Amino acid sequence: MAPRLEFEKPVIELQTKIAELKKFTQDSDMDLSAEIERLEDRLAKLQDDIYKNLKPWDRVQIARLADRPTTLDYIEHLFTDFFECHGDRAYGDDEAIVGGIAKFHGLPVTVIGHQRGKDTKENLVRNFGMPHPEGYRKALRLMKQADKFNRPIICFIDTKGAYPGRAAEERGQSEAIAKNLFEMAGLRVPVICIVIGEGGSGGALGLGVGNHLHMLENSTYSVISPEGAAALLWKDSSLAKKAAETMKITAPDLKELGIIDHMIKEVKGGAHHDVKLQASYMDETLKQSLKTLLKLSEEELVQQRYEKYKAIGKVSVEDQYIGVN
């Protein structure tokens, strides 16, 4: 098994050795159970040491993994009776955003999220999870429908950013995102947003104005990619690792800064190792959020959302700056 991430190399090597010993014991009469148990204990300790001390750049790499669970994966494990809706009723449908009606423990909800592909063919269909304007307009149509029928809205954020192509700009990409920000601020139903992978720039914000904002432990949320920031600040995109540490884009950092409400624990090694278990962690967070928000009146929901985002802009900086060489 080849390591997908450099910091996982010692883990993969030990897992491979354990697998080889288990196969050897099956093919021979030798009892190696004590040695296997010793290696498994060593593996557990090694995994704890690595995954409890991940650097920001490590988390960026995990968030970008092709087999990281997507919106549709979580919909399958968190909701029942999901009915997908298509189209923005103006131009067309956008496969980079999925959305529809579902039930969460019997409660009717509207679910919307960015959708990446897991291979080249699917990524071409999903445009690598980078929405066009019709994707954001489809999302807004579903949000207004939820507002009309008093259904809570749950948004999953997972995109490098909105698609920057010429056709998208011609169809009003910036206007579509801005309209979503404006309209989401005034929705009279609970809105819960969860960053499940990459939360990139305005493309993420287009689904990100909610009463509660949560992040998975190894997800990221930023105005620009580390590579882009490094190119702007230091004229060298190879300094992306340094930029990731400077930008404060990880869930632990953003929780400390008060940007997000809750960091959702991930299974050991990342959500891709056990999507069912990961969904159970998210299920508990969603239940707690809904329990809190459903107690609020329409006016209180709008006011709480307004105060939340108003507070994000309040910062105090004393003699701190990022040097540009």
Swiss-Prot record:
Location relative to the cell: Cytoplasm
Keywords attached to this entry: Antibiotic resistance, ATP-binding, Cytoplasm, Fatty acid biosynthesis, Fatty acid metabolism, Lipid biosynthesis, Lipid metabolism, Nucleotide-binding, Transferase
SUPFAM superfamilies: ClpP/crotonase
GO MF: acetyl-CoA carboxylase activity; ATP binding; carboxyl- or carbamoyltransferase activity
Activity control, per UniProt: Inhibited by pyrrolidine dione antibiotics moiramide B (CPD1) and CPD2.
Pathway: Lipid metabolism; malonyl-CoA biosynthesis; malonyl-CoA from acetyl-CoA: step 1/1
Keyword Transit peptide found: no
InterPro entries: Acetyl_CoA_COase_a_su, ClpP/crotonase-like_dom_sf, COA_CT_C
Broad class of the protein's primary localization: cytoplasm
Major enzyme class: transferase
Pfam family membership, one: ACCA
Subunit structure: Acetyl-CoA carboxylase is a heterohexamer composed of biotin carboxyl carrier protein (AccB), biotin carboxylase (AccC) and two subunits each of ACCase subunit alpha (AccA) and ACCase subunit beta (AccD).
HAMAP family, per database record: AcetylCoA_CT_alpha
NCBIfam families named among the record's database cross-references: accA, AccA_sub, PRK05724.1
Family: Belongs to the AccA family.
Protein name: Acetyl-coenzyme A carboxylase carboxyl transferase subunit alpha
